[in-house]
Design a protein with these regions (language model features):
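Short, low-complexity N-terminal intrinsically disordered segments enriched in polar/charged residues
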Residues: 1-22, 26, 30
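A solvent-exposed, acidic/Ser-Thr-rich amphipathic alpha-helical stretch
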Residues: 21-84
Length: 136
């Protein structure tokens, strides 16, 4: 596991959870491609617009876990990043939590003195939607 690539994945999680979508350019190429079940986003502006949909949730919490991959001779890191993405929302006057177990297929490159996502493919392992008891 590369600390730099794991750090990039953690920065993605923090930017998404904090809704700092205007900073996504610091971790993604302008030509970023993000795909998942039923969607494709082919540029950074498309990703920024697509991530606006997360504002429907009261909060999100992305827990980044395992990361396995390697740098290729072409200067591209290819690997997999595990994540549990929790989404808190209201349903019928109660709080609910939608959890998604994700295995991102990532391609990362060096760009402007740092690392940037070139692509992310979101593969779902499972989804769970349950009532939530909030901590006090």
């Amino acid at each position: 596991m590369s600390n730099d690539t794991l750090d990039l994945a953690c920065r993605y999680a923090a930017l998404i959870d904090d809704r700092r979508l205007d900073e996504l350019h610091t971790i993604m190429l302008p030509s970023i491609r993000i795909t998942g079940p039923g969607y494709v986003m082919d540029t950074l502006p498309e990703v920024e617009r697509g991530m606006e949909l997360l504002r429907q949730y009261e909060r999100t919490f992305h827990m980044v876990g395992n990361q396995l991959g390697a740098w290729g001779g072409d200067g591209v890191w290819s690997g997999e990043t595990y994540c549990i993405a929790s989404h808190v929302y209201q349903r019928d006057g109660a709080k609910w939590k939608l959890d998604m177990a994700i295995r991102y297929q990532d391609r990362i490159v060096r760009h402007d003195g740092g690392l940037r996502f070139a692509s992310r493919e979101l593969r779902l392992a499972w989804v769970q939607d349950l009532p939530l008891t909030m901590a006090r």
